C-alpha cells in the first residue's frame, strides 16, 4: 500500500497559537488533495500541564485527513526556575519536548512519506530535527510581512548596537526605518521584546529565534499581496532570506456550532446595522484595572452601543499566555453601577464570545482591538474598521501599519495616554466618535471594505495567495517523489 504524504506541524503551546495551524492545514488540504498526491497533516502539540478544553475541542473536530498527538507534558519540575515571560517559557517547553518530538517523527516516517516540518516562530527549535529527517524546514509565521521583515532584520540591528554601553537597543529619540518595511516606526512601537535589557533572557530568546528564522527553507506568511505587497516583495528579493510564501488571510471560518445560539449573537440581532462597537483583546491579552475603568467610562459617555468581551484585569498585558490567571468574575471589576446604567446601551460578556460570528454580523460597526494579527485579519476580511489599542509583542507595529499606511484603523492620538500609559475616558470617547460618526471614520470603513474584497480575490482560484499555496504544494509534492 502506498504511503501517505505527510506534513508534520509543531505549534506553540496555547490555544491561540493552534488556530492558525489548523486553519492553514485545512486550506492546504482542500486546495491540494486533487492533484495526484494525497497529503495528510499531523499536528504534534507541545504541552505544559493538561491541554485546555478549547484546545481539545479544536483538535477533536479535525477532518479525516488530519490528526494530532499531544507530546508528553513538560512538568514544573522539568522547568526548574521557569521564566515568567511567555516567550522564553514557550521556547523552553519546545526545547524540552525535542526528544518526544524526535520519537513522533520517527514513528511518522515508518508509516508515511514525511516531506516537511512546519513550526511556529517560537517553536523554531523543533526545526533542528528537519535536517536530521531530510525534510523541508518551514515556519508558519502567523503575523504579517512587516513583523517578519523586522524579525529578519533584528540580528543585524542588534549587531549594530554592540557599541551601546547602556544596554539599550536603539536611540529612543529617533524614528526607525526597517529595511524593506513601507512605514517608519517610533522605537516604542517596535516589538516589546526588544525593550528588555540586551542581557535579559527575554531579549536573548527573541534574538535566537530571529537568527534561526533566516536559516529555514520556507516561511509561510499569513498575509497577501494587496495588503503588504511592497514589503513581501522586498523580502523575496533578499538573497539571504528564506523562501516566503504569502498565502493569507488565514482565519477561522467559524467559532463553533453553538455560536449562533449564544446570548450575545441574539442581542446583535436586535441592534441597528453598523451600530455596535465590539471590544476584545484576544485570547491571551489583558488590560490593567485602571485601563478597564477608563474604557468602561468612555463607552458609557460615548452613548454608542457596545459588545465587550471582558476578562479579569492584570498589570501584565500578556498574562493570559501560559500563566495561570485568577478565576475571578470579570464583571466585579467594572465601575459601580456600570451594568445597570448601560443596560440598554451595551452587553458585557465574561471571558469569551464567538468573534467570527460577531465580526461577520451586520450590526457590528467597529472593533476596538489589541491588534493581534489574527484578530486584525478577521476584522479586515469582514470589512470591520479597527480602533487600535495594542498591548504587547508586535501589536504596536501592527497598529502603526493599520493606521499610517493601510488606513483601516484609528488610534488614540499620540500623547492621548496619561503619564502611566493609560488611555483616558475622554480619549476613548473621542476615538469612538471618530470611527462611528465622522467622515474620517467613513473613509476608514471604505478602505477596510476595499481590502476585504482584495482578501477574497487573493484566496480565490488564480489569486495571489492561491498561486503561492500551489507553489508550496509543488515543492512538497516533488519532495515526496525524490
Task: List the model feature ranges, each with a label.
Residues 1-276, 280-482:
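Glycosyltransferase specificity loop/lid
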Amino acid at each position: 500500500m502506498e504511503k501517505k504524504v505527510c506534513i508534520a506541524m509543531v505549534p506553540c503551546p496555547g490555544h491561540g497559537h493552534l488556530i492558525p495551524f489548523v486553519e492553514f492545514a485545512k486550506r492546504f488540504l482542500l486546495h491540494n488533495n486533487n492533484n495526484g498526491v494525497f497529503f495528510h497533516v499531523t499536528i504534534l502539540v507541545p504541552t505544559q500541564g493538561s491541554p485546555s478544553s478549547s484546545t481539545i475541542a479544536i483538535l477533536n473536530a479535525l477532518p479525516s485527513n488530519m490528526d494530532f498527538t499531544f507530546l508528553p507534558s513538560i512538568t514544573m519540575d522539568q522547568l526548574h526556575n521557569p521564566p515568567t515571560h511567555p516567550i522564553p517559557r514557550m521556547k523552553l517547553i519546545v526545547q524540552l519536548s525535542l526528544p518526544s518530538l524526535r520519537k513522533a517523527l520517527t514513528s511518522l516516517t515508518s508509516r508515511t512519506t514525511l516531506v516537511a516540518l512546519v513550526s511556529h516562530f517560537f517553536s523554531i527549535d523543533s526545526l533542528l530535527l528537519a535536517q536530521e529527517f531530510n525534510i523541508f524546514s518551514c515556519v508558519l509565521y502567523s503575523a504579517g510581512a512587516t513583523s517578519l521583515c523586522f524579525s529578519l532584520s533584528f540580528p543585524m540591528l542588534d549587531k549594530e548596537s554592540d557599541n551601546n554601553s547602556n544596554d539599550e537597543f536603539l536611540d529612543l529619540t529617533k524614528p526607525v526605518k526597517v529595511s524593506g518595511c513601507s512605514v517608519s516606526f517610533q522605537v516604542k512601537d517596535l516589538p516589546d521584546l526588544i525593550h528588555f535589557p540586551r542581557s535579559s533572557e527575554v531579549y536573548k530568546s527573541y534574538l535566537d529565534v530571529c537568527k534561526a528564522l533566516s536559516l529555514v527553507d520556507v516561511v509561510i506568511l499569513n498575509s497577501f499581496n494587496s495588503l503588504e505587497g511592497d514589503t513581501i516583495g522586498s523580502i523575496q528579493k533578499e538573497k539571504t532570506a528564506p523562501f516566503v510564501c504569502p498565502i493569507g488571510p488565514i482565519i477561522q471560518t467559524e467559532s463553533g456550532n453553538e455560536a449562533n445560539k449564544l446570548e450575545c449573537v441574539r442581542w446583535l440581532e436586535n441592534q441597528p446595522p453598523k451600530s455596535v462597537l465590539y471590544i476584545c483583546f484576544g485570547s491571551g491579552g489583558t488590560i490593567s484595572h485602571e485601563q478597564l475603568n477608563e474604557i468602561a467610562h468612555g463607552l458609557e459617555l460615548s452613548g454608542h452601543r457596545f459588545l465587550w468581551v471582558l476578562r479579569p484585569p492584570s498589570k501584565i498585558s500578556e498574562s493570559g499566555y501560559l500563566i495561570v490567571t485568577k478565576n475571578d468574575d470579570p464583571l466585579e471589576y467594572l465601575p459601580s453601577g456600570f451594568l445597570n446604567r448601560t443596560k440598554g446601551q451595551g452587553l458585557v460578556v465574561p471571558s469569551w464570545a464567538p468573534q467570527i460570528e460577531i465580526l461577520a454580523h451586520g450590526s457590528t460597526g467597529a472593533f476596538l482591538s489589541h491588534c493581534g494579527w489574527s484578530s486584525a485579519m478577521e476584522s479586515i476580511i469582514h470589512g470591520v474598521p479597527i480602533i487600535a489599542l495594542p498591548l504587547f509583542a508586535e501589536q504596536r507595529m501592527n497598529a502603526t501599519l493599520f493606521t499610517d499606511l493601510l488606513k483601516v484603523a484609528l488610534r488614540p492620538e499620540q500623547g492621548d495616554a496619561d503619564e502611566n500609559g493609560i488611555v483616558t475616558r475622554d480619549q476613548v470617547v473621542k476615538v469612538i466618535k471618530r470611527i462611528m460618526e465622522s467622515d474620517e471614520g467613513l473613509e476608514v470603513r471604505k478602505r477596510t471594505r476595499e481590502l476585504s474584497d482584495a482578501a477574497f480575490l487573493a484566496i480565490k482560484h488564480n489569486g495571489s495567495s492561491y498561486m503561492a499555496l500551489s507553489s508550496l504544494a509543488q515543492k512538497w509534492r516533488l519532495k515526496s517523489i525524490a
